[in-house]
């Protein structure tokens, strides 16, 4: 990458954390616990109040939370209490929802539900995973008819909710959540063509779609309103190919170069970097 401009080099972001980082403690979203039609989750050993305390202790400014962290309690009283507690801690909140999560249905919500919940907790941003299904083989399925049909419906559903998005003034981010190629996220954002609607780039998820990390970040950066900043070790052994979590900077993602790309290319709407670590660590 060419040398950064001084403006880009001096650019600062708030430091946030995705609650999925603590999913083994019951926060965020549990992953892969379906058996005989039942869904299982890690026991919750930390609640949102304690998470806010830890965030302040660690110098975080933003928490990126899910409906699991709200205990699926969306009563006005509870959401107002969450909003006030975040204010008390000096924290901004972002809300993370899915349409049809394959792993943990507790995180699912409609656009309408997510906007109301996000507004009620004072969220600055609502991030959506669209859960678009692609046919196999995945590697050459970008913008395929099966995916485009689903994406067109998603665009129409967001368009119906633009008056509410404008009313509440929250930023909206569409993620490459192991279900969308970067070009597909960009297509959705460009179809919506609204200043409050952008992309969320996860720095690991592109690997699931057989898409290069650098290429994905390069493409998505100009649209990014949200970033899940991850680093994994990627390796092969006799048991197959693996992508395992690690401390940021210890893996195979060049996080320094990615940060340079974001500082140079991302719009002003990207004001926070949300750290996310896969557990258990490699």
Role assignments for model-derived ranges:
Residues 64, 94, 127, 228, ...:
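Conserved beta-strand positions in the central sheet of alpha/beta enzyme cores
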Residues 50-53, 77-84, 88, 109-120, ...:
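Alpha-helical scaffolding segments of alpha/beta enzyme cores, especially the outer helices
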Residues 61-64, 163-172, 194-199:
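Short, surface-exposed connector motifs at secondary-structure boundaries
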Residues 89-91, 123, 170, 266-273:
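A short helix->loop->beta-strand "cap" motif at the edges of active sites that frequently abuts
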Residues 118-147, 167-182:
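Active-site groove signature of glycoside hydrolases
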Residues 2-59, 182-196, 200, 207-282:
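Histidine-acidic metal/acid-base catalytic patches
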Residues 1-125, 156, 194:
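N-terminal pre-domain/capping segments
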Residues 65-78, 99-109, 134-136, 176-183, ...:
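Acidic-and-aromatic substrate-binding clefts and catalytic sites of carbohydrate-active enzymes
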């Amino acid at each position: 990458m060419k040398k950064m401009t001084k403006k880009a080099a001096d650019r600062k972001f708030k430091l946030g954390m995705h609650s999925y980082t603590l999913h083994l403690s019951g926060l965020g979203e549990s992953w892969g616990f379906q058996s005989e039609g039942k869904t299982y989750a890690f026991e919750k050993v930390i609640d949102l109040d304690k998470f806010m305390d830890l965030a302040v202790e660690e110098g975080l400014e933003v928490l990126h939370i899910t409906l699991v962290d709200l205990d699926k309690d969306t009563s006005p009283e509870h959401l107002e209490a969450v909003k006030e507690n975040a204010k008390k801690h000096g924290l901004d909140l972002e809300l993370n929802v899915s349409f049809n999560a394959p792993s943990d249905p507790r995180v699912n919500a409609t656009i309408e539900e997510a906007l109301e919940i996000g507004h009620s907790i004072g969220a600055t941003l609502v991030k959506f995973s669209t859960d678009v299904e692609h046919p196999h083989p995945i590697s050459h399925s970008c913008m395929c008819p099966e995916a485009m049909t689903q994406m067109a419906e998603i665009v129409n559903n967001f368009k119906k909710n633009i008056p509410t998005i404008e009313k509440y003034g929250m930023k909206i981010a569409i993620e490459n959540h192991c279900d969308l190629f970067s070009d597909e996220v960009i297509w959705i954002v460009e179809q919506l063509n609204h200043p409050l609607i952008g992309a969320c780039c996860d720095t690991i998820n592109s690997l699931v779609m057989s898409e290069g990390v650098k290429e994905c970040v390069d493409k998505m950066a100009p649209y990014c309103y949200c970033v899940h900043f991850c680093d994994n070790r990627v390796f092969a052994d006799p048991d197959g190919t693996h992508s395992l979590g690690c401390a940021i900077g210890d893996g195979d993602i060049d996080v320094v170069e990615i940060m340079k790309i974001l500082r140079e290319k991302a719009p002003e709407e990207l004001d926070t970097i949300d750290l996310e670590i896969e557990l258990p660590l490699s």
